[in-house]
Amino acid sequence: MSQIKPSRLSSSAEIRGARQLDVLQRHKLAEPQQDWLAEEVPVALVYNGISHVVMMATPKDLAAFALGFSLSEGIISSPQEIYAIEITPGCNGIEVNIELSSRRFAGLKERRRAMAGRTGCGVCGIEQLDDIFRPITPLPFTQAFNLEHLDTALAQLKQVQPVGQLTGCTHAAAWINPEGELLGGCEDVGRHVALDKLLGIRAKQPWQQGAVLVSSRASYEMVQKTAMCGAEILFAVSAATTLAVEVAERCNLTLVGFSKPGRATVYTHPQRIK
């Protein structure tokens, strides 16, 4: 399997996922110059030779994305159920070929048959509210976080956004320990993809105590993905949706929105927050 390492800040000469283009800047006078733009490419996740989904993503940390997506979508329950990940760039995008165990591949094929005929716009085709929620084992209450350390974590978030610092165009997802230290993280033009990348990296690291911190809002998908991977606390820099709060309540996840210096809004299960 491709090696997965925590992302850290790189020099601009080493930046992957961004390109310089000629632009016309207007301040007082219009002047031609170069500017950095974040890359966005189609990325196909292919399981045992069958294309499962195509996502728009920043082309970095794609092995981590494949592992995190597989875990957060319930395709696998352990990294050991993926035997290999191979990344193949092409003319129209990137293929990430994932070799699944035979048992998990059989489960994926059955799941694809059950979804046949549904449209591809999220919850379209679902007949009742309960069908929206992926079966998630309620999380235990083993974690705690002191909000005094949140400012420390927020101050470090840009460390995992080298492309974002150049372009202003990426979301970040990071793992922070109970002292607010940022242990690692990822960025992407898509907030869900950034989170999947982080969850893939975390699956290969001994990070148990701590929480997820994302630079975006918290949608119900973000909550489900976090809970599916066993993380008990999710901090979002922006707001949470009503459905995100409902899902968090159901699966025992502590959801915190408006995570900014000196403030935070705890929506669910505040017993983990000090």
From Swiss-Prot:
One of its GO terms (molecular function) is sulfur carrier activity. Mo-bis(molybdopterin guanine dinucleotide) binds at F258, S259, K260, P261, G262, R263. It comes from the Bacteria. It is found in: Cytoplasm. InterPro entries: Cytidine_deaminase-like, FdhD. The active site is at C121 (cysteine persulfide intermediate). Its main location: cytoplasm. One of its GO terms (cellular component) is cytoplasm. One of its GO terms (biological process) is Mo-molybdopterin cofactor biosynthetic process. Keywords: Cytoplasm, Molybdenum cofactor biosynthesis. Transmembrane segments: none annotated. The keyword Cytoplasm applies. Coiled coil: none annotated. Belongs to the FdhD family. Required for formate dehydrogenase (FDH) activity. Acts as a sulfur carrier protein that transfers sulfur from IscS to the molybdenum cofactor prior to its insertion into FDH. This is Sulfur carrier protein FdhD. It comes from Yersinia pseudotuberculosis serotype O:1b (strain IP 31758).
